[in-house]
Amino acid sequence: MITAALHEPQIHKPTDTSVVSDDVLPHSPPTPRIFRSKLPDIDIPNHLPLHTYCFEKLSSVSDKPCLIVGSTGKSYTYGETHLICRRVASGLYKLGIRKGDVIMILLQNSAEFVFSFMGASMIGAVSTTANPFYTSQELYKQLKSSGAKLIITHSQYVDKLKNLGENLTLITTDEPTPENCLPFSTLITDDETNPFQETVDIGGDDAAALPFSSGTTGLPKGVVLTHKSLITSVAQQVDGDNPNLYLKSNDVILCVLPLFHIYSLNSVLLNSLRSGATVLLMHKFEIGALLDLIQRHRVTIAALVPPLVIALAKNPTVNSYDLSSVRFVLSGAAPLGKELQDSLRRRLPQAILGQGYGMTEAGPVLSMSLGFAKEPIPTKSGSCGTVVRNAELKVVHLETRLSLGYNQPGEICIRGQQIMKEYLNDPEATSATIDEEGWLHTGDIGYVDEDDEIFIVDRLKEVIKFKGFQVPPAELESLLINHHSIADAAVVPQNDEVAGEVPVAFVVRSNGNDITEEDVKEYVAKQVVFYKRLHKVFFVASIPKSPSGKILRKDLKAKLC
């Protein structure tokens, strides 16, 4: 899951599916209840190649800043960015990369990441993006699974790539160039004003990106995203007369989330390129540097994950900076509780704060707050908005698989041209995720309220089963994070001979606070039903999370063994 939001129980109380009434389970199969966006569908030019679509407005923004490297201040206009991307395309082609070939981009956020991804698109190559902090073993698995022929990386990661393949081409973006590697300048030495004249027939169903799922609930699998699926997803967000996410060409969009993750790649980079906005690249998070960049470059859009939202809401350093330029704060990857949202709103009263929901396989965005629309519609606290345009969403019963109506929690399913084509070389996993009618089953539990707003309760596989009762960890985590003495928290199941599983919490204390285990237990017990009460609390220095901000529950469960 890339983006998610947690419902606020005091605002909405969905029907408990443990008791199913006759109107939920009729004697004859009902017509499926399908939910759609409150915004009208739009025409989407998803017959185009991705790069053509993203740079379609090039002539009108050619002299505008496209990329700004936060650490150096170096800026590239749209005209310069497009030209370098074409030179990279030419360089890759000269190195033997052809349509359908896979290249691996192993970089932190940088201009070279953008040049490489878009350059690969121009020749019909496929980019598989990888986490630079992966181990050699993890990189080998992704390299082998994807079949990548070339890796573009930074010299500091080269040692991890030794012995991964004799015929593997390594290109590094910095100087000096390590032994047996080619400098990035090799790709951009084509000094023609109109480089790469080859004609490549790229269809909408051809693969453009090959991200790998996080593996927190299973083995990583290559997710085939086509030119059509990526264009559809971007258009669902930023195209049309009243876009769901209203970006303007004078917007400056903070890119601190890693581009190797689909959330940042899609909702930050591709959305920005399509809109003619400026992308401010930050290669790693550090609160002081982030605040300085927001102030110095007058950032207007900040796409974040909850840990960064917590920093903005709770870190006293924030008060020393002028953040008045920010108009949208997008949050995803995990829930935001109401108190945390209120804290951030006090810090950024002029900004609209909203959440979205998605997953890599869905292209990735399923829903988004309509508060970000050109003609905004207020969204409830805890909601992750309505389903995106040109898509269909339904909620199915966890056992009967029948379609459910309003306020009835079940598994979220999505259908539309934005979803993945398949899992790479894994037809069994593909058919288990996308059914014969084209519905992608997310594995997320949620419901749609009477205003068509979506509330995610939890991951299906992460639900704790206490004597048959379902205990959603995200609900308890939201309560914990809203406590003034708690900086971060995660809840996981611990095996129990009597109950089967019991919820236990890992808690990070706020600076200077000495909250005890009993304090935490009592705080939660006052707010939840008996079977959701915490049985143990462990205090830790930090909560392990993936680059996208998802809690690595398997690491915490391992501590309980």
UniProtKB/Swiss-Prot annotation:
The tissues where this chain's protein is expressed are given as: Preferentially expressed in leaves, flowers and siliques.
Q: Which PROSITE patterns match?
A: AMP_BINDING
Q: What is its EC number?
A: 6.2.1.12, 6.2.1.34
Indicate yes or no for the key word ATP-binding: yes
State a single Pfam family of this protein: AMP-binding_C
Q: Which UniProt keywords apply?
A: ATP-binding, Ligase, Magnesium, Nucleotide-binding, Phenylpropanoid metabolism
Residues given in the record as (E)-4-coumaroyl-AMP binding sites: Y263, S267, A333, Q355, G356, T360, M368, K461, K465
Name the job this protein performs.
Produces CoA thioesters of a variety of hydroxy- and methoxy-substituted cinnamic acids, which are used to synthesize several phenylpropanoid-derived compounds, including anthocyanins, flavonoids, isoflavonoids, coumarins, lignin, suberin and wall-bound phenolics. Follows a two-step reaction mechanism, wherein the carboxylate substrate first undergoes adenylation by ATP, followed by a thioesterification in the presence of CoA to yield the final CoA thioesters.
Per the record, the domain comment is: Both substrate-binding domains (SBD1 and SBD2) are involved in the substrate recognition, and are sufficient to confer the substrate specificity.
Can you say what this protein is called? 4-coumarate--CoA ligase 3
For this protein's source organism, the top of the classification is: Eukaryota, Viridiplantae, Streptophyta, Embryophyta, Tracheophyta
Q: Give the encoding gene's name.
A: 4CL3
